[in-house]
Amino acid sequence: MRQYLDLLEHVITTGTDRGDRTGTGTRSVFGYQMRFDLSQGFPVLTTKKLHLRSIIHELLWFLRGDTNVAYLKDNGVSIWDEWADENGELGPVYGYQWRSWPTPDGRHIDQIAALVEGLKTNPNSRRHIVSAWNPALVDEMALPPCHCLFQFYVADGKLSCQLYQRSADIFLGVPFNIASYALLTMMVAQVTGLEAGDFVHTLGDAHIYRNHFEQAQLQLTRTPKPLPKMEINPAVKDIFSFRFEDFELVGYEADSHIKAPVAV
């Protein structure tokens, strides 16, 4: 995952120091892109160990259309706890927008179902897009979507995905986002009869929080290891039927975890 270390180094050396919503302060750049060929291994960091369980369960939670942290907590995932209210609710966040986008006439659009159907029936379309950024509901969300829009593209029997991320917490969030959307691309490829191609990650405000500088410098001293392979149960043909047990990361070797505080 040299691409990720290059991003860290680029922001540390060329970024601008700025204030931010959390009051922590950041160093950031505006506009950055990484590309990962999914045939070359699963793009998960090897220079610090990631909690893959959290990544998989969060993605399955999104695909359920869920907006309550109960499912996550039941599965030992706490990454959304800081933003949930006393009942575990987060408002109309990712899952709601993906699966139940509200229209002015009272209907709801299942963007994921429409995406899969479109890829099967009209793969050359340039409209294979899912948006989580709903201006009418942003103020009702506990945390407006950081990874807010993604598009799929089919060529030569391969499915590629490009994500636009408006706000990118490089040290804590981006490694999760890379693995999550790479996995989503593989899942969608499987259920549409395609091979996984590239995951393209486009960042808007790409930032490192001030209280992550030391951890980022430590990570830059580490050498990337070979990428592992993600094996997915080939029997699953419906995007909404995947379960945690359908995924196995084979050959994952990583350096020790590096702790860092979350800016809320």
UniProtKB/Swiss-Prot annotation:
Catalytic activity, EC: 2.1.1.45
Catalytic activity: dUMP + (6R)-5,10-methylene-5,6,7,8-tetrahydrofolate = 7,8-dihydrofolate + dTMP
Family annotation (Pfam families): Thymidylat_synt (PF00303)
Active site feature: C146
Keyword annotations from UniProtKB, A to Z: Cytoplasm, Methyltransferase, Nucleotide biosynthesis, Transferase
Pathway: Pyrimidine metabolism; dTTP biosynthesis
Amino acids binding (6R)-5,10-methylene-5,6,7,8-tetrahydrofolate: H51, D169, A263
SUPFAM superfamilies: Thymidylate synthase/dCMP hydroxymethylase
Any single Gene Ontology cellular-component annotation: cytosol
Gene Ontology terms describing biological process: dTMP biosynthetic process; dTTP biosynthetic process; methylation
Disulfide linkage: none
Localization of this protein: Cytoplasm
Highest taxon of the lineage: Bacteria
Major subcellular location class: cytoplasm
Role noted for this protein: Catalyzes the reductive methylation of 2'-deoxyuridine-5'-monophosphate (dUMP) to 2'-deoxythymidine-5'-monophosphate (dTMP) while utilizing 5,10-methylenetetrahydrofolate (mTHF) as the methyl donor and reductant in the reaction, yielding dihydrofolate (DHF) as a by-product. This enzymatic reaction provides an intracellular de novo source of dTMP, an essential precursor for DNA biosynthesis.
Record family assignment: Belongs to the thymidylate synthase family. Bacterial-type ThyA subfamily.
Subunit structure: Homodimer.
Protein name: Thymidylate synthase
Encoding gene per record: thyA
